[in-house]
Amino acid sequence: MSSALMPVKTHIVIPARLKSTRLPNKPLLTIHGKPMILWVAEKARLADFADDMCIATDDESIAKICLDAGFDVVMTSSEHASGTDRLAEVAAIKGWAAHDIVVNMQGDEPLVPPLLLEQVKTLLVQDAESVMATLCEPIEDYDTFMRPSVVKVVSQTSNDQQRALYFSRAPIPCNRDVVLTSENSKQPPKNAYRHLGLYAYRVSLLQQFVHCSQTPLEILESLEQLRVLENGGHIAIAKAACSLPAGVDTQEDLDRLNAMSLTDFQDY
């Protein structure tokens, strides 16, 4: 049977590692008494469009907690330069078909709506020429636009397909007229978008990605998706169908989630 006739399977992978510079041991920190990684895995389990899901980790303590809770775990190398490299190892270990789709669910975003996971997967299915898909949302305030921790994205529309042109920590696009005036409007451009860290990949892209060295812009911006663009790949992008709640990067973020009632947290 040709690959064109074979069914496309969708796999959700949750990369989880302990080495966080801002919040050590992040996947194992608890929200309402349960390790964060388990909240994320339970959310992924609600995504009924996927054929399967697993947690990818290089840490035995994370693996044990997830295995004890009944989740599939894949042990991966601790030497990966990026999360995408880790996904590629999982795809190789699992023997997934080149035309299959992998959805990357961040291990520090326990409130991700399954709707967005399905949206990013569908986006990739609908754009046969793209090797990745991701989402974005409008930036409404100037401080967010200027913040380096917020990744911005500019895109183009070609043949009714919207694709990313560039991702940056810098404030892009730049409003030339505002920059050249003495009075800054303190308003982001109307077409300023924040990139959301949800990705869908074709396994064929993951197979190629690991053989490509880190690229100059990827290293400069510390954004792994730039490796795809610098090697000529297309990344489909769309405005998120709903808002993506903030993930957990700091102790304040963790405290905010623990301050929510358990019912509100579970029903989010």
Curated annotation (Swiss-Prot):
Location(s) in or outside the cell: Cytoplasm
Name the chemical reaction catalysed here: 3-deoxy-alpha-D-manno-oct-2-ulosonate + CTP = CMP-3-deoxy-beta-D-manno-octulosonate + diphosphate
Gene encoding this polypeptide? kdsB
| Taxonomic lineage from the root | Bacteria, Pseudomonadati, Pseudomonadota, Gammaproteobacteria, Moraxellales
One GO-annotated biological process of the protein: CMP-keto-3-deoxy-D-manno-octulosonic acid biosynthetic process
Looking up Pfam families in the UniProt record yields:
CTP_transf_3
Read off the NCBIfam families from this record: kdsB, PRK05450.1-5, PRK13368.1
Instruction: Name its pathway.
Output: Nucleotide-sugar biosynthesis; CMP-3-deoxy-D-manno-octulosonate biosynthesis; CMP-3-deoxy-D-manno-octulosonate from 3-deoxy-D-manno-octulosonate and CTP: step 1/1; Bacterial outer membrane biogenesis; lipopolysaccharide biosynthesis
Question: Signal sequence span per UniProt?
Answer: none
Q: Name the GO cellular-component terms.
A: cytosol
State the UniProt keywords alphabetically: Cytoplasm, Lipopolysaccharide biosynthesis, Nucleotidyltransferase, Transferase
Which InterPro entries did the record assign? Cytidylyl_trans, KdsB, Nucleotide-diphossugar_trans
**Gene3D superfamilies per UniProt:** Spore Coat Polysaccharide Biosynthesis Protein SpsA, Chain A
UniProt main location, coarse: cytoplasm
Which GO terms fall under molecular function for this chain's record? 3-deoxy-manno-octulosonate cytidylyltransferase activity
Q: What is this protein called?
A: 3-deoxy-manno-octulosonate cytidylyltransferase
Keyword Metal-binding listed? The answer is no
Q: Does the keyword Ion transport apply?
A: no
Principal EC category = transferase
Record's function text: Activates KDO (a required 8-carbon sugar) for incorporation into bacterial lipopolysaccharide in Gram-negative bacteria.
